Regions:
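Low-complexity intrinsically disordered segments
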Residues: 70-73
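Short, well-structured beta-strand
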Residues: 2, 6-11, 16-17, 24-25, ...
């Protein structure tokens, strides 16, 4: 698990608005029409442009249904291996409500992650990242069943055991009260 303190560019006033902010930030970053070299910014756009160019060269001259199916399967596979839009959901674990999203599809990628974001204040959130890497087909088969249920079997239990409290210095409270 990786824990990050993150600041989002827009203000939010609850978990539902945080969900919308995270989804838009993700889309703006990975789907940026102008990819930035040596970063992941615009990576989905770049990957899909390459996939479309290849599919056009490979299958545009053929018009039968089998070729169209092959082309569509190729493009769908590339879409799922890139960075398709995410969908955030609200989930309450213990005393906290998180904005949760899944990145990656185990059927298409060897990296899969679930991210739980806990809103703090002033556009800040704590981001808990559970990242999984699958190596080889055998490990994928063995690990797949566990991975698909790990959000409830493992991640939720970890997050429920966290004790998160506001850090308040009693000296600062005494000064501000005077």
């Amino acid at each position: 698990m990786i824990v990050r303190l993150k600041k989002v560019p827009q203000s939010f006033d609850g978990i539902e608005s945080l969900n919308a902010v995270i989804e838009q930030e993700y889309l703006d970053f990975y789907h940026d029409p102008v990819p930035v070299e040596r970063t992941l910014r615009g990576r989905h756009t770049e990957d899909m442009n390459h996939a479309s160019e290849y599919a056009k060269k490979r299958w545009d001259d053929y018009s039968d249904d089998e070729d169209k199916k092959s082309r569509d399967a190729y493009i769908l596979g590339n879409y799922m291996r890139a960075y398709p839009p995410i969908k955030c959901t609200s989930i309450t674990l213990g005393k906290q409500t998180y904005s949760k999203y899944v990145e990656g599809d185990i059927n298409y990628k060897h990296i899969f992650q679930r991210v739980y974001n806990l809103p703090l204040k002033d556009n800040y959130m704590l981001s808990f990242l559970f990242k999984y890497r699958l190596e080889g087909e055998e490990s994928k088969k063995k690990f797949r069943k566990w991975l698909l249920s790990s959000d409830e079997a493992f991640e939720h239990k970890v997050l429920e055991t966290l004790e998160i409290s506001r850090l308040v210095d009693p000296q600062l409270n005494a000064i501000s009260a005077k």
